[in-house]
Amino acid sequence: MAKVIGIDLGTTNSAMAVYEGNEAKIIANKEGKNTTPSIVAFTDKGEILVGEPAKRQAVTNPKKTVYSIKRIMGLMFNEDKAKEAEKRLPYNIVDRNGACAVEIADKIYTPQEISAKILMKLKEDAQSYLGEDVTEAVITVPAYFNDSQRKATKEAGTIAGLNVLRIINEPTSAALAYGLDKKEAEKIMVYDLGGGTFDVTVLETGDNVVEVLATGGDAFLGGDDFDNRIIDWAAEEFKSDEGIDLKNDVMALQRLKDAAENAKKELSSAQETEINLPFITADASGPKHLVKKITRAKFESLIDDLIEDTIKKIEFVIKDAGLSQSDISEVVMVGGSTRIPKVQERVKAFISKDLNKSVNPDEVVAVGAAIQGGVLKGDVKDVLLLDVTPLSLGIETAGGISTKVVERGVTIPTKKTQIFSTYEDNQPAVSINVLQGERELARDNKSLGRFDLSGIPAAPRGVPQIEVTFDIDANGILTVSAKDKATGKSQEIKISGSSGLSDAEIEKMVKEAELHKEEDTKKKAIIELRNNADSLVYQTKKSLEEFKDKIESAEVEKIQSAVAALEETLKNENASKEELEEKIKNLTEVSHKLAEAAYAKEQGGTQQGTDTKKKDDDVIDAEVE
């Protein structure tokens, strides 16, 4: 049976592993290394280099050497993070159909295509190691990758000729590799700080089950950012000394990047190191050399705020899981950047627990992916992974209310269905605005996408039944569909993720939801009251048309007057809750005679049965544009 390889497709380095002989083993690449630089280069001769060969020539070919492509995977070109990446990366980032792509020698490549070249290299090396074709893989992604980023990763695998059996979250994968599923029931925290992304996840493990309780992170925080702090510091020092800005010279900047990365690594074991770059640039007076000593203390001061950001996210995720620091039994450190002493020190101080560093942080995620591959192939028995939705999902309904369909923290895969209806008579279509967030009003949440369901037969408002289904698969990819139950017509959208959320946005949204909870509840109550008032006016007018000859003309005038008064109040957008309630009460009271006439007709058997009415009561008015 063909082997499934587990792949950690990293920002700076990638790794692969395979499950064989009842254990997961790291596969070395053709160069004999356990990790492969996630770098692709295009030479003037038309060659494409991947991994170590690409890294070696980066200094002399910065414009055609692509690294950290994961940072723009699934990113829209107009996002702030794309602009930030443009400033930092020496190659050209361009707009391709609204999404980020790279331009090399007048040719445009998507992040999926670049990533696919890395995956192809890993695939070929795995085939060489195993002595057989490799066609299936499990690929890991940061827990906080949005739908677009997950899809882009899967597409990269497809381009590389791999059937991606599962996209698995990196912290969950790490928990498998540490064998945490075999222990007694415990609450585990995985702190994953890699080259370009940060994840923190709280899991409950034991009895062969790994269940995610809460997750958070930042898709744009990692070792690259630590390197950038050294680059900025060294460039500023050089500018102060020589009056030359190295950031305007891409070749000098690439040399400085390599030196900064090496300095960072050396400072994990040494108290001081030297950045020594002879002939870094030149001016009219001759060549210039950059020679700067940097101490560990200086490096720690440069990155202190970034480390504190990770601590804040730990605090947020533990709270989101409904736990306190004392509930955490074990802290697992994952990712190359966790080798930095200051990172270890701060995490240990915050959690007050010794850190689990028993597995190589660069390899652990790939090992876990290989174990998951074994699970999917049936080679590993009785292991169950349970991931969760990070935020609630729903749609916009009448009056701009956000109606939740899938609550935050629901275990995936999941499928939820809810029935909605039309807001106006003879409405031919409904517009579905898919939302993500915890706020009561649609405008305060994130819109993930919109689609229309048309061809609804003419019918009074509230009669059509529109079945809206949210389907989240095991990869965390969302599909939303809407179906008119009468005609069977349906429409669906696979959420593009163009409005995907960073963890900072998540935290902000959750905090805002808490902060504005009372205010939101009041606003929602007013909107619902207005919806009820509008519905009452509609039903009263309809009943009046049908039964006005059954009641006295004086009663008809009273009802018409009360309807007009309520309509006038509804025209006032600032009408208070009390005003609305008073007018609703008045119309309800004067309409008693009308209700009696309607009831008398129903008793006569000319009205539809109560079962239909009861069914309609459960239908929610859908917002239509």
From Swiss-Prot:
GO MF, one example: ATP-dependent protein folding chaperone
Pfam families, alphabetized: HSP70
PTM annotation (Phosphothreonine): residues: T197
Region annotated Disordered, chain positions: 598-625
Induction, as annotated: By stress conditions e.g. heat shock.
Keywords attached to this entry: ATP-binding, Chaperone, Nucleotide-binding, Phosphoprotein, Stress response
Role played: Acts as a chaperone.
Protein family per UniProt: Belongs to the heat shock protein 70 family.
NCBIfam families: PRK00290.1 (NF001413), PRK05183.1 (NF003520), prok_dnaK (TIGR02350)
Protein name: Chaperone protein DnaK
Organism (species): Helicobacter hepaticus (strain ATCC 51449 / 3B1)
Gene that encodes the chain: dnaK
